[in-house]
């Protein structure tokens, strides 16, 4: 693992620090931007050419990251200081082997292995970290799924054991929905659906992400620093809007930090963790954890100072560089710059060479901006950008971010202009 660092080299020279990004989407792109600002050499890897992070990396490789030989060839050629997974579709055995050979897998291979599988994740949260979760059970056949849903009670949630972004998940309102839930998992999971997890429905006030970052302090000891919790909401199980700070009680906020600390202490390593939780009043339940920057955390591009977004925090931790913080009531907290919010810009058409319009209106809104990710292909539901807004009132930031996002229209080579339909879809107002 990286040790505390006081110096950095220069990219493309023999003094360079190198990172390999396994996954080159919008989150990897922001990590790459932060790395470029510190003179770190960036190697981007993904399954398709010209992925967002590849567009600004020093070098890139295209291949199937589920194949160990491909990963070994890239790492052995580049010999990076850190290997940073950004997606789930990675050969986990290869990560363990590379770690055994002395490479730094961020945060560590075991944490990545746990987080990419819902059964391993849930058992780690409930049994090792011993934090509150919703009630849950598992099912491997359709008959078992009927039994599991009856056991947990309706309504409940079913999720493929390996997937992400809501793919293969279903909200089961009654027995009549069980076959559809089974079919959804089998057809749409991004990974394995050999088993489903069935979870109790929590009637929460807000869903939050705590972006806990493990890093070295000034004494060379590993500590955990906590930014303010990020509120978010989803559509079809996928992030649609986020804001910071989440509107929760002080008591709930302290419980969020306590739960995140227990989970990240169990997982170990260095870097940022997106710990997803449900909050109702003062009660908090852990849901899932991602050992890397979280899509809801893009709000920190505005809410945190320059260089200290979740991506900057992740990179500092990975490189062994310091992160400022202040101890309050036993927790090391990272200060916000301003309340802020994001709202996604999603494709509703298919095709190559996406083109955007409405930017004159969108970029005329004070204290707001747009990030377009540079993905070369669109398909319905694919996230192609995000609107970001900031304001002293987080509610106003939410409103502004949604308005800006829905000002953007999209077309591709094979489809005419389509709007985001702001007037028809005022989710937050």
UniProtKB/Swiss-Prot annotation:
It is an enzyme of class 6 (ligase). ATP binds at residues 118, 159, 199-202, 207. Pathway: Purine metabolism; IMP biosynthesis via de novo pathway; N(2)-formyl-N(1)-(5-phospho-D-ribosyl)glycinamide from N(1)-(5-phospho-D-ribosyl)glycinamide (formate route): step 1/1. Mg(2+) binds at residues 276, 288. Its EC number is 6.3.1.21. Residues 123-319 form the ATP-grasp domain. It catalyses: N(1)-(5-phospho-beta-D-ribosyl)glycinamide + formate + ATP = N(2)-formyl-N(1)-(5-phospho-beta-D-ribosyl)glycinamide + ADP + phosphate + H(+). InterPro entries: ATP-grasp, ATP-grasp_carboxylate-amine, ATP_grasp_subdomain_1, PreATP-grasp_dom_sf, PurT, PurT/PurK_preATP-grasp, PurT_C, Rudment_hybrid_motif. GO terms for molecular function: ATP binding; magnesium ion binding; phosphoribosylglycinamide formyltransferase 2 activity; phosphoribosylglycinamide formyltransferase activity. GO terms for cellular component: cytosol. GO terms for biological process: 'de novo' IMP biosynthetic process. It comes from the Archaea. Keywords: ATP-binding, Ligase, Magnesium, Metal-binding, Nucleotide-binding, Purine biosynthesis. N(1)-(5-phospho-beta-D-ribosyl)glycinamide binds at residues 26-27, 86, 295, 375, 382-383. It holds the Pfam family ATP-grasp. PANTHER family: FORMATE-DEPENDENT PHOSPHORIBOSYLGLYCINAMIDE FORMYLTRANSFERASE. NCBIfam families: PRK09288.1, purT. Belongs to the PurK/PurT family. Homodimer. Involved in the de novo purine biosynthesis. Catalyzes the transfer of formate to 5-phospho-ribosyl-glycinamide (GAR), producing 5-phospho-ribosyl-N-formylglycinamide (FGAR). Formate is provided by PurU via hydrolysis of 10-formyl-tetrahydrofolate. This is Formate-dependent phosphoribosylglycinamide formyltransferase. The gene is purT.
């Amino acid at each position: 693992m990286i040790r505390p660092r006081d110096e950095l080299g220069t990219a493309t020279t023999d003094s360079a620090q190198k990172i390999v990004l396994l996954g080159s989407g919008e989150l990897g792109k922001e990590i790459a931007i932060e790395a470029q600002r510190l003179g770190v050499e960036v190697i981007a890897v993904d399954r398709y050419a010209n992925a967002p992070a590849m567009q600004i990396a020093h070098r890139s490789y295209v291949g199937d990251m589920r194949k160990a030989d491909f990963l070994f060839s890239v790492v052995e050629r580049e010999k990076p200081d850190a290997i940073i997974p950004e997606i789930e579709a990675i050969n986990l055995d290869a990560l363990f082997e590379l770690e055994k050979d002395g490479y730094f897998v961020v945060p560590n291979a075991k944490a990545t292995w746990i987080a990419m599988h819902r059964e391993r994740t849930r058992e780690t949260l409930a049994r090792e970290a011993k934090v509150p979760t919703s009630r849950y059970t598992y099912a491997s056949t359709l008959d078992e799924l009927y039994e599991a849903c009856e056991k947990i009670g309706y309504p409940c949630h079913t999720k493929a054991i390996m997937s992400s972004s809501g793919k293969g998940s279903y909200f089961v309102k009654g027995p009549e929905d069980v076959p559809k839930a089974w079919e959804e998992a089998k057809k749409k999971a991004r990974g394995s659906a050999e088993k489903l997890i069935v979870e109790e429905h929590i009637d929460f006030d807000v869903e939050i992400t705590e972006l806990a970052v493990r890093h070295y302090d000034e004494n060379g000891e590993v500590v955990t620093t906590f930014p303010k919790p990020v509120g978010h909401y989803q559509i079809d199980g996928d992030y649609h809007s986020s804001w910071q700070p989440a509107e929760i009680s002080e008591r709930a906020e302290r419980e969020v930090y306590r739960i995140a600390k227990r989970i990240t202490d169990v997982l170990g390593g260095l870097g940022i963790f997106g710990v997803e939780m449900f909050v109702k009043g003062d009660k908090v339940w852990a849901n899932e954890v991602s050992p890397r920057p979280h899509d809801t955390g893009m709000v920190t591009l505005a809410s945190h100072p320059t260089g200290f977004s979740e991506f900057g925090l992740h990179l500092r931790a990975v490189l062994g560089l310091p992160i400022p913080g202040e101890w309050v009531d036993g927790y090391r907290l990272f200060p916000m710059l301003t309340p802020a919010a994001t709202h996604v810009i999603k494709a509703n058409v298919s095709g190559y060479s996406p083109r955007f319009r409405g930017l004159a209106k969108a970029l005329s809104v004070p204290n707001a901006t747009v990030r377009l990710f540079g993905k070369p292909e669109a398909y319905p539901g694919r996230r192609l950008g995000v609107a970001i807004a900031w304001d002293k009132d987080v509610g106003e930031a939410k409103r502004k971010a949604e308005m800006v996002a829905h000002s953007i229209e999209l077309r591709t080579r094979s489809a005419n202009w389509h709007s985001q339909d702001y007037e028809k879809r005022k989710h937050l107002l």
